């Protein structure tokens, strides 16, 4: 590796300590005269960083300040976030990351170590990845997006790079994935966002999105080159559009080590929540009847993961399918509707199974007809869970599970406080964005957040350690159970899922469980004698 000295050290975020360099380090690294004489510990630096963040009035400004630190001093960045994880995780990732994405081109202040690829230049993939990995250690994890399906805010093209940088930051904060072992990648395939196409400051290619054969060939080349340059790498696909996300996952999931957080991750978090809910209601997952409001990538992914769990509990494939009701913009998805995705077709109901005069367009009508035990929201439609719909859930169930998990808060189907109030405290609530505790009738209800950060960092940790040839549904199921088992549910008002303050503990448990499962399935490409020891040894700690 190249030996850095002087200004090169200060310009390298992995090496730079700012005022944290000791006198001996300043002499040996050629830093004499390049820094103020004061030497500060990382603890002293963190206090100053946090005080500065606290003075900033809005979350986007806080995000930009912290990302500036990320670009200058990676160690101090991770040390600071780790000290204030509950407060700062929503700043560096969801929900604030949505604002950062929308304002990325206007606030551009460097690439943050990301690799920028273009569908127009398939021949440059290898050169670009080599450049991005230069001066890093072994690349064990790549998070890649094409920016078409960013959170709940849609197509933001190359601005989606903020998502992959933020996602990898969460991997490090939560699971201790070494930042020198990861690579953020954004694929510029154009954009269908008219606002970006007409924005003179937009940094991406200003043409409509490329689809079809040209796009598919590019993805294929990217997958091949990534695995050639970085053998045993985990490829995490993030925020691809509905038309491509599932196709990519289905094409490659049995060929390489890959994971799609939007399809699989959200589903695993719902399995975790359902496992916890099963403990509270004394009703196993296989006995639940589920309405999913939102038939996109996340909604179908949730159905798939819970379906797998139901089959594990003894239901046949057909029996499990019959437990799901998926609602999209035209109402309940039935087999007489046109232009359904392959995922939607799988869960489409026979229209003839319902009375001819029955309305299947409104959520309330579907709830009244099928009487579900569980309602999950992935639509991104704010306020979609009406008071009438919620009260029907409470009428039909002693403890209805209601989970509006769309992000950010402005796109959530309902607020936790409304759900508790409308059900007279009966609802078991999980939300997508952080929710404050709700006080109702003398009880404080702690609201679980279906934060995928409880899953994917630990999953990645276990995968990086075991290096399996692929990521299986059984590994995801083991991860879901590990998350659910961490929470004490005996107290009234207890959160269904662990809080983000337990991210490190959760990630370790998930990592160990996934590593064990990889070995159990015989898919590990790394010889491991003790999963727990191997996982703990892999964890990076941010410190000078």
Predicted stretch roles:
Residues 27, 31-34, 55, 106-109, ...:
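Generic secondary-structure signature for well-ordered alpha-helical cores
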Residues 9, 15-16, 261-262, 281, ...:
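Adenosine-phosphate binding glycine-rich loop
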Residues 128-130, 152-163, 194-201, 245-251, ...:
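Short acidic, glycine/serine/threonine-rich loops at helix termini
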Residues 359-425, 467:
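Long hydrophobic segments that form regular secondary structure
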Residues 1-257, 517, 544:
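N-terminal ligand-binding/catalytic initiation module
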Residues 255-256, 260-374, 525:
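Glycine-rich phosphate/diphosphate-binding loop of Rossmann-like nucleotide-binding domains
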Residues 232-238, 284-288, 313-322, 488-498, ...:
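Flexible, glycine/charged-enriched surface loops at secondary-structure junctions
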